[in-house]
Swiss-Prot record:
This is CASP-like protein 4A3. It comes from Arabidopsis lyrata subsp. lyrata (Lyre-leaved rock-cress). GO terms for cellular component: plasma membrane. Residues 43-72 have a biased composition (Basic and acidic residues). InterPro entries: CASP_dom. The keyword Transmembrane helix applies. Homodimer and heterodimers. Belongs to the Casparian strip membrane proteins (CASP) family. The chain crosses the membrane at residues 127-147, 168-188, 206-226, 245-265. Its main location: membrane.
Amino acid sequence: MPSMSPSSISTEKSPPPSDTSMAIVAFDNSTTHLSSSPSPPHSLDHSSDSEKEDEKRRPESRRNKNPVKIEETPSPIVVVHNHNRSVKEVVPTRKTARVGSGRSSGQRSGAVLAILRRSRREEIVKFVALGFRLSEVVLALISFSIMAADKTKGWSGDSFDRYKEYRFCLSVNVVAFIYASFQACDLAYHLVKEKHLISHHLRPLFEFIIDQVLAYLLMCASTAAVTRVDDWVSNWGKDDFTEMASASIAMSFLTFLAFAFSSLISGYNLFNQDSL
């Protein structure tokens, strides 16, 4: 085994300083790309010079690159911020639109239900009014028919036409019968054709006034006839004449009740003319 001097051993074991410089040059790739042509390896002095030049260039390149980064980095943030902002603005509008549509649909459904309830109530009122009109027709017909037939024969015979109270009761019931018959026909025609026989803007007021007047007249006529019957019975006692007069007066009083309810319905129609 040949002997080796200490100088040679030290030179072999000590790493060349150019390795570190080579590592540094190899690490910096940006400088190599910036150069127009690749430079061949040089000596240690030239490599150290190149390192110094690279170190000088690095701050300049960083200074040049930093403004670009500062200018570019806010742009994505602004875009993202604007995008997020627009999304946040759009979402509430959609929610509000949905809520508004729900409210509007709820209001429409509530309005439809109110209209249906009102139309149903109007139909019920019309049928009730027709029922009272038919009752008035029947009761008034029975009342004046009995009163017109209240006559007795013989030497002690008597007749209703001799007493003004009975004549008054018969006349009022005849008028009530004619008026109630016309109103019953008009209501029946309105339920079928949805229009009146005589259409006028004063018709509800006319019905209300006539119902009130006839109800008052029927009450007065029935009261006057009852007074005459009571006077007859107290003087002469009961007989067929007084019994028929009493039956006619009872029907006249029931006719008054029917007209009283009809006057309430006509008052309702007067203050709700839009439904007519």
